[in-house]
Amino acid sequence: MQKMVWAFIVASAVGLLIGPWLIPYLRRLKFGQSIREEGPKGHQRKAGTPTMGGLLFLIAVPMAVLVTVGFTPQSGVLLLGLLGFGLIGFLDDYIKVVKKRNLGLRAWQKFTGQLILSLILIYGVVYGIDRGTSLYLPGFEVWWDAGALYYPLALLLIVGTTNAVNLADGLDGLAAGMTFWVALAFAAIASAGTSDVTAAFAAALAGGCIGFLFFNHHPARMFMGDTGSLALGGAVATLALLTRTELILPVLGAVFVAETLSVILQVASFKLTGKRIFRMSPLHHHFELGGWPETTVVYTFWAASLISAFLGVLLAMPIRF
């Protein structure tokens, strides 16, 4: 518990300390956010806000983890999930901002990178720390050895989670605030399961979100970019693997799931019927275009994330790992 608390404090403090330096540094490099014309009109005023602020997570979280629990097989895998996906996001942001290629990495390039990194993570979790291929079935309180089926399921979970967090990063403070509650839930789950290293990492991730939110709450002074959203998604997915909560993650991150489903349903509906279900997807834009102030949407989604994270913790309590 003590390591977990210190990891949270260190990550928060580091984030708060480097934020005032990072923002002007990104401005000097002219790493400003470009806003899509087809997005909500009110977002155009955000153009030029420094992006790639997710670098804060890539500094604060590893520092907190290494200071509190050091480098172990578990912390190594968790840091790989954070830093590896953060690197993919950084390359995507760099191409968008510096190379002026609006879409960043091509879809096949991003997917290939995510696929390779996911396979490395799965191998590290299953064999490197001997996690095995068993899955906990919530509600039934039984374990099922998925065998070879575990690998595609884990692959879907990692890639899906990283992109779900990326989709949710559309309003000031939204993705970081939602991830904060999920990370805090993982800290509680890991602590109850007597995994100090995993609990410390989850607490550091939550602390990093708090440090970042100080500069990202409305009106945001910097955005995390894909650097941050993919890093957060990769970290959350890896936490699910290590805590054996793969099948509970959709509950823990239910709002992220809703954001993703809104995009899938919107695209499918438009292709099949020519009509849209939502005013705009992801879901947060639907409410925004319905007249909700941005802060109201964000606070509502934060509250929903808190509730879903709490329910996820209750489902995970029988697990001991």
Swiss-Prot record:
Localization (cell): Cell membrane
Entry cofactors: Mg(2+)
Spans traversing the lipid bilayer: 4-24, 51-71, 75-95, 109-129, 139-159, 173-193, 195-215, 222-242, 247-267, 297-317
PROSITE patterns: MRAY_1, MRAY_2
Keywords in alphabetical order: Cell cycle, Cell division, Cell membrane, Cell shape, Cell wall biogenesis/degradation, Magnesium, Membrane, Metal-binding, Peptidoglycan synthesis, Transferase, Transmembrane, Transmembrane helix
Pathway note: Cell wall biogenesis; peptidoglycan biosynthesis
Enzyme class: transferase
GO biological process: cell division; cell wall organization; peptidoglycan biosynthetic process; regulation of cell shape
Membrane topology: Multi-pass membrane protein
Membrane keyword on record: yes
InterPro entries found in the cross-reference section: Glycosyl_transferase_4, PNAcMuramoyl-5peptid_Trfase, PNAcMuramoyl-5peptid_Trfase_CS
Any one annotated GO CC term: plasma membrane
EC number per UniProt: 2.7.8.13
Recorded catalytic activity of this chain's protein: UDP-N-acetyl-alpha-D-muramoyl-L-alanyl-gamma-D-glutamyl-meso-2,6-diaminopimeloyl-D-alanyl-D-alanine + di-trans,octa-cis-undecaprenyl phosphate = di-trans,octa-cis-undecaprenyl diphospho-N-acetyl-alpha-D-muramoyl-L-alanyl-D-glutamyl-meso-2,6-diaminopimeloyl-D-alanyl-D-alanine + UMP
Its job: Catalyzes the initial step of the lipid cycle reactions in the biosynthesis of the cell wall peptidoglycan: transfers peptidoglycan precursor phospho-MurNAc-pentapeptide from UDP-MurNAc-pentapeptide onto the lipid carrier undecaprenyl phosphate, yielding undecaprenyl-pyrophosphoryl-MurNAc-pentapeptide, known as lipid I.
Entry similarity comment: Belongs to the glycosyltransferase 4 family. MraY subfamily.
Name by which UniProt lists this protein: Phospho-N-acetylmuramoyl-pentapeptide-transferase
